[in-house]
Amino acid sequence: LVRYYGRMGYNTKNLIGSINVDPIKNMLLKGKALTREQVATKIAETVKAAKALVNYRVVGVNSVVLNNSGAYAAQELAYALAWGAEYMTMLTEAGVANYKAANAIRFNMGIGGNYFMEIAKFRAGRMLWAKIVEAYKAPIFTTALRNAAKMNVSAETSRFNMTIFDAYVNLLRTQTETMSAAIAGVDEITVTPFDATYEQPTDFSERIARNQQLLLKEEAHFDKVVDPAAGSYYLENLTASIAAEAWKQFLAIQEQGGMY
């Protein structure tokens, strides 16, 4: 990709994007066993190969696969944090600077059907991920690491709760899920077409999925306010509750050796 951009004459410093390299996800979905050393080598080589793409995030944490398997909000968040922390450890052990390691990681998370719970999940995630990244300071918490501590999230509407019967009802589910993610301030949203559970999405269903986001942006103006949930007693309290439960589960995972 770097060579291609070079041949095309692009300035790689001006390019923004992501590459979803995630060996742990492949193991979860395909059952192929990889050693910790193999995973660490894969992601470290990916980050080093993409060093010219300074605004690219090349390592993915795909907890969306857990969401699509029925994981609840705090559970998905806990495993996503443990997943990300594992990659942070692998990268820093491979000699990648802490802030570069944090900047390389992108979270691909699912959006469940519990409207307020999902808003709280993403808000809690930003807080807890910053706490984890801060633990990698060596020997001081530099400005670069502080800036890199912001959780980058791509959210995808869940497939777990979609029905094949009266599939247009899925539009209601995906619309409220999209609203949850937008209010929570994620960086990117993917709306699953309403017919994706039983057929290859059609041109019509894909167009509707795109328009669902445009409605929230252009007509509801969901892109105009930063953290619109801030100050709401209910959402602030729910965010704290989700954060506490997710952190408890995260620590339990770490006590058992982390994702490996």
Which residues does each PLM region occupy?
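Catalytic alpha/beta active-site cores
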Residues: 1-114, 139-154, 182, 188-192
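Short polybasic/polar patches that bind polyanions
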Residues: 6, 134, 254
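Glycine-rich beta-alpha junction loops
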Residues: 65, 129, 195
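Short glycine/threonine-rich loop-to-helix capping motif typified by GTGT followed
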Residues: 71-77, 112-124, 158-171, 199-209, ...
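Long amphipathic alpha-helical segments
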Residues: 85, 92, 124-144, 170-188, ...
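Active-site or pore-adjacent capping/gating segments
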Residues: 176-179, 186-260
